[in-house]
C-alpha cells in the first residue's frame, strides 16, 4: 500500500496552480526557500551533485538546487503539482527531472544513487514518516547527505503553526496541517538512527512577524531542520 494520504494529495493538488505565486497560499514556502537552500548547500555543496527532492510539490526547492548546478530529480504523488513543476521548469529553463513515484518505490529501483536527498515539509503529511526516512537512507550514497524539515509537536507549535498561521494570520489555508502528525525532534532522531543514518545537526527556524521573515535559530519548538549523513 502506498505511504500516502489521498486527502493530503488532493489538498495540494487543488492548490497546484498557485505553487509559483509568491503572494498566494505557498508564500511561506517561497519565504523559507532561500534559508533552507543555503543551509543545505552549506552542508552538501550542491554544484555537480546528484540530488533527489522527495515530496517536491511544484518544484520550488528542486529548481533552486538545480540553479546552483545540481542534477536534480523531483518526485511527488500529487500529479497536478508535478505538472505545474514541469511547466515552470520549461518556462524558467532550469532543468529538473520530475516523476510521479513514491519514495519507497524509487528507493527499490535506485538504491544508493544520490549524493543528496531532501525531504522538506513532507514528513508531517504522510501516514508513516519512518518509512520515508528509511527510503531516504536507501537512496543516498555512502557518505551522502539527507535533509529533512518538519514541525515539532507541542503546545507552542499548535498555537503558532496551526491556530496562528492558519486561522489568525491566514498565512496558510485552513486545514493545511494535522497537529497529530507533527513530529518531535527526538522521534525524528529515532527514525534517522533506525534507518542507519548519522544525525549531524538539528536547527530551528523562527518566524519574525514584525519583519515578516524566517531565520535560522536554535529554537526548534516549531519548525526545524535535520541534517544527516550515511556512513561511508
Swiss-Prot record:
Record's keyword annotation contains Kinase: no
Pfam family, one: Methyltransf_23
InterPro entries tied to this protein: SAM-dependent_MTases_sf, UbiG_MeTrfase
Sites where the protein binds S-adenosyl-L-methionine: 36, 55, 76, 120
UniProt KW keywords: Methyltransferase, S-adenosyl-L-methionine, Transferase, Ubiquinone biosynthesis
Superkingdom classification of source: Bacteria
Gene Ontology BP terms: methylation
CDD domains associated with the record: AdoMet_MTases
First-level EC class: transferase
Biological function: O-methyltransferase that catalyzes the 2 O-methylation steps in the ubiquinone biosynthetic pathway.
Protein family membership: Belongs to the methyltransferase superfamily. UbiG/COQ3 family.
Identification of the protein by name: Ubiquinone biosynthesis O-methyltransferase
Amino acid at each position: 500500500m502506498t505511504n500516502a494520504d489521498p486527502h493530503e494529495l488532493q489538498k495540494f493538488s487543488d492548490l497546484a496552480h498557485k505553487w509559483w505565486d509568491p503572494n498566494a497560499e505557498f508564500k511561506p514556502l517561497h519565504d523559507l526557500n532561500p534559508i533552507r537552500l543555503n543551509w543545505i548547500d552549506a552542508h552538501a555543496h550542491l554544484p555537480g551533485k546528484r540530488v533527489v527532492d522527495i515530496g517536491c510539490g511544484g518544484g520550488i526547492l528542486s529548481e533552486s538546487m538545480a540553479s546552483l548546478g545540481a542534477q536534480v530529480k523531483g518526485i511527488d504523488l500529487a500529479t497536478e503539482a508535478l505538472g505545474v513543476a514541469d511547466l515552470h521548469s520549461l518556462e524558467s529553463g532550469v532543468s529538473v527531472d520530475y516523476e510521479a513515484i513514491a519514495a519507497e518505490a524509487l528507493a527499490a529501483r535506485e538504491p544508493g544513487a544520490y549524493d543528496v536527498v531532501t525531504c522538506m515539509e513532507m514528513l508531517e503529511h504522510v501516514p508513516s514518516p519512518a518509512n520515508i526516512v528509511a527510503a531516504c537512507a536507501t537512496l543516498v550514497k555512502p557518505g551522502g547527505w539527507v535533509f529533512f524539515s518538519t514541525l515539532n509537536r507541542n503546545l507552542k507549535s499548535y498555537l503558532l503553526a496551526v491556530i496562528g498561521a492558519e486561522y489568525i494570520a491566514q498565512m496558510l489555508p485552513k486545514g493545511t496541517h494535522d497537529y497529530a502528525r507533527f513530529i518531535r525532534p527526538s522521534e525524528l532522531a529515532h527514525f534517522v538512527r533506525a534507518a542507519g543514518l548519522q544525525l549531524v545537526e538539528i536547527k530551528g527556524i523562527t518566524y519574525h512577524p514584525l519583519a515578516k521573515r524566517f531565520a535560522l535559530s536554535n529554537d526548534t519548538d516549531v519548525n526545524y531542520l535535520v541534517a544527516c549523513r550515511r556512513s561511508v
